[in-house]
Design a protein with these regions (language model features):
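N-terminus-centric sequence/structural signature that marks the extreme N-terminus
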Residues: 1-142
Length: 142
């Protein structure tokens, strides 16, 4: 079981208080550390902060989160907990459409699918999950 936490305000500029906001994200991870003792990470942008602790089960080496993906001028960041049962099929479909992957887990597949298809991609997921996905390009938290 992993843990996700964060904050969002479309009118904020959290980077003006970068040290303070990063400290809050780190404290969020400390509170939820029991949910994922193997790895932790944070992400901070002007309007969004994400914190993630991870229990390594799948993709032990390259599954660090929050995970960021960039395609051209479109970039997104995900903090995710769960298991996508149909991830291999979704990943194969995305590869056939030209996507390339740097990791072996389902996190990057969710991120790539979202970036290719938009929020409707979530309807294709078969599994148990909680997702916080920050679309940096349109400054929207999904």
């Amino acid at each position: 079981m992993c843990g996700i936490a964060g904050f969002f305000n479309p009118s904020a500029d959290y980077t003006k208080e970068k040290n303070y906001r990063n400290h809050i994200l780190e404290m969020m991870n400390q509170v939820q550390k029991h949910r994922g003792p193997d790895d932790e990470g944070t992400f901070l942008s002007p309007q969004c902060g994400l914190a993630h602790v991870r229990l390594n089960i799948i993709d032990l080496v390259t599954g660090h989160q929050p995970m960021r993906r960039v395609r051209g001028d479109h970039s997104c960041v995900i903090a995710y907990n769960g298991e996508i049962y149909n991830a291999p099929e979704l990943k194969a479909e995305l590869i056939s459409e030209g996507e390339q992957f740097l990791t072996s887990g389902d996190t990057e597949a969710i991120l790539a699918g979202f970036m290719r298809c938009g929020p409707s991609f979530i309807k294709k997921l078969n599994g148990i999950f909680a997702i916080a996905l920050w679309d940096e390009s349109c400054q929207t938290l999904h």
